[in-house]
Amino acid sequence: MSNLPRDLSDLPRNMAEEVLSRVPMTSLRRLRFTCKKWNTLSRCRSFAKKHLVCQAKVAAKKREYKVVMMMDFRVYLMRINLQNNVELCIKRERELLFPDASDQIYVRHVFHCDGLLLCIMKDNPRLVVCNPYSGQTRWIETTNNPQRLDAYSYALGYNSSTKSHKILSFGMMFDYVSSTSAEFKIYDFNSDSWRLAVLFQRMDTLQMEIWVTTKIEPNTVSWSSKFFLSVDMRELTGRYSMFSFSDASFFIDEEKKVAVVFDKGKKK
């Protein structure tokens, strides 16, 4: 008995993980403020996965599930019980709060990936990423047109090689002068910046070049010192062929140094 810790905060890490993983998510946040070590542990990525697995097993036994739901442009954590015939089978546990927001915010879309939530604002060009476990939030500035927020779509993903999340922004613009144009941008969490790839083709030599930004700010754009890819299109097509200004699109794989270009009306 003398070898047992006198204080719960002195528990070994593996034992503390086992204890905290059994605590419901709604109570976990209150426990963080009682112990600095527990607060640090609960923000760990490995613990978040363990907590998810443990809570999923408990919910499966009760046939009870937790989901993220949007109502009236608010984001809530909901509890659904499929065996409860007396009380309400759907209960609202808590609202997702944004402590760094000065005004009431309204969410238009929510995306989930590996424990993080990407929230797209209804009337604000900024994005916010929230970790429901740690309570951390990150506000992300964009260069999107605030008058055309509905023209942009987003996706949240995780890159296992760099161990970092990324956000894909896709915008489809249309006007009567230049027809339709597409815009793709990637936000990298490690560098805390957006990245943009631009395809440039010379009219005289048909040389195609793809350049990638290193940083995008509201009034400044920085480019890599060397182009990502350069190709002599005459060797591929054997004739004079220019990509369309408005109908062509492309994507690149930086690791494999590969680019794929799509052009409307072209067979290759």
UniProtKB/Swiss-Prot annotation:
Naturally occurring in which organism (per UniProt): Arabidopsis thaliana
Domain called F-box: residue spans: 5-51
Pfam family, one: FBA_1
PANTHER family (UniProt xref): BNACNNG10540D PROTEIN, F-BOX PROTEIN CPR30-LIKE
Protein name listed in UniProt: Putative F-box protein At3g23420
Source organism superkingdom: Eukaryota
UniProt cross-references to InterPro entries, sorted A to Z: F-box-assoc_dom_typ1 (IPR006527), F-box-assoc_interact_dom (IPR017451), F-box-like_dom_sf (IPR036047), F-box_dom (IPR001810), SCF_F-box_component (IPR050796)
